[in-house]
C-alpha cells in the first residue's frame, strides 16, 4: 500500500522510505468506520514478523483482602490518537491512507499503531463499571509538521500490584475493566512502487472517492493499480504533497502491497553512483550510524512488548561502483528482523522517483543483508543513501533477561549500543499464574502458534482449569467477542508438556526444543473439552509448571488482512471456594485508524523536469549559435540538489543534453555544472534570450507549474601558452648573448609548476633552442642542467631577453607566451698539477742543484670526495704530472720509496721545498706545479747480520809396515829393524765476517763461527826377523812413512745494509775439510850368508806438515849428521826400497778407497 504521509521523499518533506508492511500485536484497537481505498498496512513488531502483544487480565469472583498482595496493577495501552467508542460491535477498520478533501464533519486522521502489548489486569470487583471510551489523540499532528515515517512503538504493561482489588463470588456477573489508552508513533507504510504484488480478489471492491464530492468516484481499482504501475506512481506523487494533518491519505490496493510482519524498515536515497564487481564495501563511506531502543529513553528492550531496536545508517556510494556489485548490512547476532515469520526479505533501496538502486537478500544464519546494485549506479553519480532497519531481540539466543552490547555494521563499519533485555512476568492472582505469547505465524498455512506458561511459579493450585479461546478474554476470564479471532476446535493442535521441579523455564516465554520436557498431552485426552470456539483443559490440583503449545487456524479477511486474536486464562479456587482468574490475550491487528468521513483521491500532482544543454562557446560571447564552430559538450557532470540537501548527478549525452525529472511544483532546486578540464566558463547571461544564454556554473530554479528546459551553460577552451628560449656558449664569459656565440645542443631543461611538481622535461636543439607548450597562466620554475665540460656564466647582466637567467629561474605566464628564459655557459678550462720528487742528500728539505730526482715514486691524486682519479710514477728525473683537471680541491699522496726517509717539509719557498707525504691543493683557474717531496738515507740501521762459519777437517793417517827378514847362517847374525811412523795433521779454519750497515734505527750483528778438525793417524808396523846363520850377517831395514795433511778453510762473509727501517742480514758459512792419510809398508828380507856379517841400522824419519794462512808453506831444514851409507849392503838397500815402494803403493790405494 502507499502511505505517502509516511514516506520520506528526497524533497523538503524528507526522504522516501520504501516500506514493507508490518504486523503488530496488541490488546485493543479502535477506529472510525470510514473505509478508504488501498492496501491495509500490516503493522507489527518485527521486520516481516507478527509480534504478539500479551494483554493479560485476571479476575476473582470473590473479595479477599488477604490476596491483594498477589494482585498486579494493570495499565492498558492503546495505540490510537483518535477518540472512539470501544465496544464489540465496532470492528477494527482497515487503515486507508487516502488523499481526500476535508469535510465539515470530518474527524481528524488517526493512525493506529500495532504492537504486542502485555496489558494485564488482575482484579475482582463487586460491581460492574461502565466502560470508558479510549482517549485517543490524532496521530497526524506529528505527520503534518514533520512528515516523518510512522514508527511502531510498544510499551510493556507494568507488572505492578493492584492494591484496589475486590473479590466477588464466581457466580457474579463480570464487570467491564477500565481501559486507558496511550498514543504511539504511527506505523510507516510500504512504498508500493517497490513491492511485490499480492493476489487480488476477483472483484473490484475498493474505489477511491472524493470526500467532498461523493457522487464522482475516481475509477481506480486494485487491478488497475496492479497492472498500471505508472498510475500507482502518479498516486504516490500526488499524495506526497498532501497535507495529511487535515486530509485522509490515499492507499494502494492490498494486492499490490506485500505484507511484512514486524518489518520496520525505512530506506532513503539521495544520490546515484557507479559500480565494480563483487563486494565493494570499501567503496561505501558511512557518514552516520545510530542504534535506538524503542523511544530511546532508557535503552531497555521490552521484548514481549515488541519494543524494537532501530538501526539508522547513512552512507555514500562511490562512483566506481558498478551494476552487480554488492555491499553488506550486518545485524547483531542477538537480534532478528522478524519475530514471528521466516519472511526476512529486506526492502529495496530506491530513489525519490521509485527507481531501484539496490535489491537485498537476507542470510538468516549470518544475520546479514547483501544488497546488489542495479544499473542505477551506472546511470547516476554521487549517490547518498539512508537506511532504517528495525529488529527485535532474538529469544533463541537471549532466553533470559540480561544486558547486551548490540553491534550493527554497514559495509563493515560498526557501531554499538548497550541495551537491557526485559521480559514479561506472569500474571498472578491467588494461585492462578499464567503468561503467553504468539511465537510463529505461517501465512501460507494460515496458522498461528501460541505458547502458554501454566503455573510458571509452581504454586500449589487447586481445581486448575485453563481456557484457550479463539478471541480475547475479558477481565473475568469470560470470552469477549469482537475484532480478531482464531479457530479453536477438535482440529486445533494442542500439546501439553510438564516441567520438572529441577527445570527452569526461560523468561522469554518461547520454547525451541520441547523434547527436554515431559510430553503429557495424552493425559488430557479425557480432560479436554471444546465449546463455542474455546478449549478447556482440566489440570486438577497441581504444583508443577506446564507448557501448552497451541497451533490454531485463522481466517484472513477478504482483503488479506490479519485480524487475529487469541486469549487464555487460568482459574483456581482458594480455600474459600472462590475462583481466582489470571488471563492473557494475544492478538495481531492489520489496520491503521483514520478520522471519519469518506475520501477521494486528490487530483494527481503533476511532476516537472528541468535541464537542457552544455556547449563549447568558441567565440566566448556567452550566446549559443553565434559561431559555426560551436558544438555540444558530452560527459559534463551536472548535479541536482533537492530542497532537503540531497543530490543526484548525471552527465550530458553526446548532444550535450541533460535532464532531471520527477520534480515538484513550487519547490526550488539547484543545478551545478562541473567545469571540464581544459575549459573555462563562458560569459553569463550574454543575451536576454533565456534559452540561448549561459546560466553559469551554478543556477537556482523554482518550478512554477511547468518544465524549465532553459538551464544551459557554455565553456570555452582555456588558452594555452609557451615558455622557453635559448641556451648558448658564452665564449667571452660576459653573460650576454653575442651574435657570434653559438647555441649549445642537448642541454636538459626541466619545467616545474608552482608546487614544485615536474610537469615537463626537454633538451635544447642543435641551435640551443627549447620550448614548453600548452601551458596555462601561472608561475613556473625552469631548471637548466650544466652541460659536461661547461661552467655557468654570470647571470642577469642586461636585458631579460639577452642575458643569462642562471641555472634556476622563475617564469610567469600571464595571457601570453614567455620566451625570455635563457642560460649561458662557457667551456670549463682544464688545469695541471705536479712537479718533483728528489733525493735530499743533505736532509735540509730544499732542492739543491746537486741533488737528483728519484725515479718510480708512486703518486696518487684524489678529488674532494676522496675518490682516486689518477695514479702515476715519477720519471727518471723524479718528475710527475696530472693533466685535464677542473678547478677544485684535490689531494696528492706520495708513496715513500723503500729504504728512504721523508725529509723535512715546508722549509722554503713552495716550489723548492718538500710538501710531505700527503698534500691538499686547490686549483682555481691555474696550474699548480709546486707539489714536491724529498727523501734521504738514514745513518742508523736496523740490521741483523748472522754469519755462521763451520770448518771441519778430518785427517786419517794410517801407516802399516811389515818387515820380514829371514836369515840362515851358521855364523853369528845381528838383525836390527827400526820403523818410525810419524803423522802430523794441522787443521786451520779461518772465518772472517764483515757486516757494514747504515740504518736510522737498530742494528744487530751476529757472527757464529764453528771450526771442527778431526785427525786420525794409524801406523801399524810389523817386523819379523828370523835369522839363522852360521856366519855373520848384517841386515839393515829402514822404513820411512810420512803423512802430510793440509786443510785450509777460508770463509769470508760480508754484509752491507742500509735501511730506513729494519734490515736483516744473515751470512752462513760452512767449510769442511777431510784429510785421510794411510801409509802401509811391508818389507820382507831373506838373507842367507855363511859369512860373518855386521849389520848396522839407522833410519831417521822427520816428516813435517805445516798449514799456514793463505797456504804459505815452509821447507824442512836439512838433517845434520853423517849420511855415509856407502858401506850398506846392496841387498839391504834393495829390500828397503822394495819395502818403501810397497808401503807407498799400499797407502795410495787405501787413500783412494776412502
From Swiss-Prot:
One of its GO terms (biological process) is cell adhesion. GO terms for cellular component: extracellular region. Residues 77-90, 166-178 have a biased composition (Low complexity). The modification Pentaglycyl murein peptidoglycan amidated threonine is found at residue 1120. The keyword Zinc does not apply. Residues 607-719, 720-829, 830-940 form the CNA-B domain. Residues 54-230, 904-1129 are annotated as: Disordered. Coiled coil: none annotated. InterPro entries: Adhesin_Fg-bd_dom_2 (IPR011266), Adhesion_dom_sf (IPR008966), Fibrogen-bd_dom1 (IPR011252), Ig-like_fold (IPR013783), LPXTG_anchor (IPR019931), SDr-like (IPR050972), Sdr_B (IPR033764), SDR_Ig (IPR041171). Residues 1-52 form the signal peptide. Residues 118-129, 179-212 have a biased composition (Polar residues). A motif (YSIRK-G/S signaling motif) lies at residues 23-34. Residues 61-75, 92-108, 130-145, 221-230 have a biased composition (Basic and acidic residues). It is a peptidoglycan-anchor. Keywords: Calcium, Cell wall, Peptidoglycan-anchor, Repeat, Secreted, Signal, Virulence. Residues 1121-1154 form a propeptide. A motif (LPXTG sorting signal) lies at residues 1117-1121. Residues 53-606 are annotated as: Ligand binding A region. PROSITE patterns: GRAM_POS_ANCHORING (PS50847). Belongs to the serine-aspartate repeat-containing protein (SDr) family. PANTHER family: TOL-PAL SYSTEM PROTEIN TOLA. Interacts with host complement factor H/CFAH (via C-terminus). Interacts with host complement regulator C4BPA. Cell surface-associated calcium-binding protein which plays an important role in adhesion and pathogenesis. Contributes to the resistance to killing by innate immune components in blood and thus attenuates bacterial clearance by interacting with host complement factor H/CFAH and modulating its activity. Also inhibits bacterial opsonization and killing by interacting with host complement regulator C4BPA and thus inhibiting classical complement pathway activation. This is Serine-aspartate repeat-containing protein E.
Amino acid at each position: 500500500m502507499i502511505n505517502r504521509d509516511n514516506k520520506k521523499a528526497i524533497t523538503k518533506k524528507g526522504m522516501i522510505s520504501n516500506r514493507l508492511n508490518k504486523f503488530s500485536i496488541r490488546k485493543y484497537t479502535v477506529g472510525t468506520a470510514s473505509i478508504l481505498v488501498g492496501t491495509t498496512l500490516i503493522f507489527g513488531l518485527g521486520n516481516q514478523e507478527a509480534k504478539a502483544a500479551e494483554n493479560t487480565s485476571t479476575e476473582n469472583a470473590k473479595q479477599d483482602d488477604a490476596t491483594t498482595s498477589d494482585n498486579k496493577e494493570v495499565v492498558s495501552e492503546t495505540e490510537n490518537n483518535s477518540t472512539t467508542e470501544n465496544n464489540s460491535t465496532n470492528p477494527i477498520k482497515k487503515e486507508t491512507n487516502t488523499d481526500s478533501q476535508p469535510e465539515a464533519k470530518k474527524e481528524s486522521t488517526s493512525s493506529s499503531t500495532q504492537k504486542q502489548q502485555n496489558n494485564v489486569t488482575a482484579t475482582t470487583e463487586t460491581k460492574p463499571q461502565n466502560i470508558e471510551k479510549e482517549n485517543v489523540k490524532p496521530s497526524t499532528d506529528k505527520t503534518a509538521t514533520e512528515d516523518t515515517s510512522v514508527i511502531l512503538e510498544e510499551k510493556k504493561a507494568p507488572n505492578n500490584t493492584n492494591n484496589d482489588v475486590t473479590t466477588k463470588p464466581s457466580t457474579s456477573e463480570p464487570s467491564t475493566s477500565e481501559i486507558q489508552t496511550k498514543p504511539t508513533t504511527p506505523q510507516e507504510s510500504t512504498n508500493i512502487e517497490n513491492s511485490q504484488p499480492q493476489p487480488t480478489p476477483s472483484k473490484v471492491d475498493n474505489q477511491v472517492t472524493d470526500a467532498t464530492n461523493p457522487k464522482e468516484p475516481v475509477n481506480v481499482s486494485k487491478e488497475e493499480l496492479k497492472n498500471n504501475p505508472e498510475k500507482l506512481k502518479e498516486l504516490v506523487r500526488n499524495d506526497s504533497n498532501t497535507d495529511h494533518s487535515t486530509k485522509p491519505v490515499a492507499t494502494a490496493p492490498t494486492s499490490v502491497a506485500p505484507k511484512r510482519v514486524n518489518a520496520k524498515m525505512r530506506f532513503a536515497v539521495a544520490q546515484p553512483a557507479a559500480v565494480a564487481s563483487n563486494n565493494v564495501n570499501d567503496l561505501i563511506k558511512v557518514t552516520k550510524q545510530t542504534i535506538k531502543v524503542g523511544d530511546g529513553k532508557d535503552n531497555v528492550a521490552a521484548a514481549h512488548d515488541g519494543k524494537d531496536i532501530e538501526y539508522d545508517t547513512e552512507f555514500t556510494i562511490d562512483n566506481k561502483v558498478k551494476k552487480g556489485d554488492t555491499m553488506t548490512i550486518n545485524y547483531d547476532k542477538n537480534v532478528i528482523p522478524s519475530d514471528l515469520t521466516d519472511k526476512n526479505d529486506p526492502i529495496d533501496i530506491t530513489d525519490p522517483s521509485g527507481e531501484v538502486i539496490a535489491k537485498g537478500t537476507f542470510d538468516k544464519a549470518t544475520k546479514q543483508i547483501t544488497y546488489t546494485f542495479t544499473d542505477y549506479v551506472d546511470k547516476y553519480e554521487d549517490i547518498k543513501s539512508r537506511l532504517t532497519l528495525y529488529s527485535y531481540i532474538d529469544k533463541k539466543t537471549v532466553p533470559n533477561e540480561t544486558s547486551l552490547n548490540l553491534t550493527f555494521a554497514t559495509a563493515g563499519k560498526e557501531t554499538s549500543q548497550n541495551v537491557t533485555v526485559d521480559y514479561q512476568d506472569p500474571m498472578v492472582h491467588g494461585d492462578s499464574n499464567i503468561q503467553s505469547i504468539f511465537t510463529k505465524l505461517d501465512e501460507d498455512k494460515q496458522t498461528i502458534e501460541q505458547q502458554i506458561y501454566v503455573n510458571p511459579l509452581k504454586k500449589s493450585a487447586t481445581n486448575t482449569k485453563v481456557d484457550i479461546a479463539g478471541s480475547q478474554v475479558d477481565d473475568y476470564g469470560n470470552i469477549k467477542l469482537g475484532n480478531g479471532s482464531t479457530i479453536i476446535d477438535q482440529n486445533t493442535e494442542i500439546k501439553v508438556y510438564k516441567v520438572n521441579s529441577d527445570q527452569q523455564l526461560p523468561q522469554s516465554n518461547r520454547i525451541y526444543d520441547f523434547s527436554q520436557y515431559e510430553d503429557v498431552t495424552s493425559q488430557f485426552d479425557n480432560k479436554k473439552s471444546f465449546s463455542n470456539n474455546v478449549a478447556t483443559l482440566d489440570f486438577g490440583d497441581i504444583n508443577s509448571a506446564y507448557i501448552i503449545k497451541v497451533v490454531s487456524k485463522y481466517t484472513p479477511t477478504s482483503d488479506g488482512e490479519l485480524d487475529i486474536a487469541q486469549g487464555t486464562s487460568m482459574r483456581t479456587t482458594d480455600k474459600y471456594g472462590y475462583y481466582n482468574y489470571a488471563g492473557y490475550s494475544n492478538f495481531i491487528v492489520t489496520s491503521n485508524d483514520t478520522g471519519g468521513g469518506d475520501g477521494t483521491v486528490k487530483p494527481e500532482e503533476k511532476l516537472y523536469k528541468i535541464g537542457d544543454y552544455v556547449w563549447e562557446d568558441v567565440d566566448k560571447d556567452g550566446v549559443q549559435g553565434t559561431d559555426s564552430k560551436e558544438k555540444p559538450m558530452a560527459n559534463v557532470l551536472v548535479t541536482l540538489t533537492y530542497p532537503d540537501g540531497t543530490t543526484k548527478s548525471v552527465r550530458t549525452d553526446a548532444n550535450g543534453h541533460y535532464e532531471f525529472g520527477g520534480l515538484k511544483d513550487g519547490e526550488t532546486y539547484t543545478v551545478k555544472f562541473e567545469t571540464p578540464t581544459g575549459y573555462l566558463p563562458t560569459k553569463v547571461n550574454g543575451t536576454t534570450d533565456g534559452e540561448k544564454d549561459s546560466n553559469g556554473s551554478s543556477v537556482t530554479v523554482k518550478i512554477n507549474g511547468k518544465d524549465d528546459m532553459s538551464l544551459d551553460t557554455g565553456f570555452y577552451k582555456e588558452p594555452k601558452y609557451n615558455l622557453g628560449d635559448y641556451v648558448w656558449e658564452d665564449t667571452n664569459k660576459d653573460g650576454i648573448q653575442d651574435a657570434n656565440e653559438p647555441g649549445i645542443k642537448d642541454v636538459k631543461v626541466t619545467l616545474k609548476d608552482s608546487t614544485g611538481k615536474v610537469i615537463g622535461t626537454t633538451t635544447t636543439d642543435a641551435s640551443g633552442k627549447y620550448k614548453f607548450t600548452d601551458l596555462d597562466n601561472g608561475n613556473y620554475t625552469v631548471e637548466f642542467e650544466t652541460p659536461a665540460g661547461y661552467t655557468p656564466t654570470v647571470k642577469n647582466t642586461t636585458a631579460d631577453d639577452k642575458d643569462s637567467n642562471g641555472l634556476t629561474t622563475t617564469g610567469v605566464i600571464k595571457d601570453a607566451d614567455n620566451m625570455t628564459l635563457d642560460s649561458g655557459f662557457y667551456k670549463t678550462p682544464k688545469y695541471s698539477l705536479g712537479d718533483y720528487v728528489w733525493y735530499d742528500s743533505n736532509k735540509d728539505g730544499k732542492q739543491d742543484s746537486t741533488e737528483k730526482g728519484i725515479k718510480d715514486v708512486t703518486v696518487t691524486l684524489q678529488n674532494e670526495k676522496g675518490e682516486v682519479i689518477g695514479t702515476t710514477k715519477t720519471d727518471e728525473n723524479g718528475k710527475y704530472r696530472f693533466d685535464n683537471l677542473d678547478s677544485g680541491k684535490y689531494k696528492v699522496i706520495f708513496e715513500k720509496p723503500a729504504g728512504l726517509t721523508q725529509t723535512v717539509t715546508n722549509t722554503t719557498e713552495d716550489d723548492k721545498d718538500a710538501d710531505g707525504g700527503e698534500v691538499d691543493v686547490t686549483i682555481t683557474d691555474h696550474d699548480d706545479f709546486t707539489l714536491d717531496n724529498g727523501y734521504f738515507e738514514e745513518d742508523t740501521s736496523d740490521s741483523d747480520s748472522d754469519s755462521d762459519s763451520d770448518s771441519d777437517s778430518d785427517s786419517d793417517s794410517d801407516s802399516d809396515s811389515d818387515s820380514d827378514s829371514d836369515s840362515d847362517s851358521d855364523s853369528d847374525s845381528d838383525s836390527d829393524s827400526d820403523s818410525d811412523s810419524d803423522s802430523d795433521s794441522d787443521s786451520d779454519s779461518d772465518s772472517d765476517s764483515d757486516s757494514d750497515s747504515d740504518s736510522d734505527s737498530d742494528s744487530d750483528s751476529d757472527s757464529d763461527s764453528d771450526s771442527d778438525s778431526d785427525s786420525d793417524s794409524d801406523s801399524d808396523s810389523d817386523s819379523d826377523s828370523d835369522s839363522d846363520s852360521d856366519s855373520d850377517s848384517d841386515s839393515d831395514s829402514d822404513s820411512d812413512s810420512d803423512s802430510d795433511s793440509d786443510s785450509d778453510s777460508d770463509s769470508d762473509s760480508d754484509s752491507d745494509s742500509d735501511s730506513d727501517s729494519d734490515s736483516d742480514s744473515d751470512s752462513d758459512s760452512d767449510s769442511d775439510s777431510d784429510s785421510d792419510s794411510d801409509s802401509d809398508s811391508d818389507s820382507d828380507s831373506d838373507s842367507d850368508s855363511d859369512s860373518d856379517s855386521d849389520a848396522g841400522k839407522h833410519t831417521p824419519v822427520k816428516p813435517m806438515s805445516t798449514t799456514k794462512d793463505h797456504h804459505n808453506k815452509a821447507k824442512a831444514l836439512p838433517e845434520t849428521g853423517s849420511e855415509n851409507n856407502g858401506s850398506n849392503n846392496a841387498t839391504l838397500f834393495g829390500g828397503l826400497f822394495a819395502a818403501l815402494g810397497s808401503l807407498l803403493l799400499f797407502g795410495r790405494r787405501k787413500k783412494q778407497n776412502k
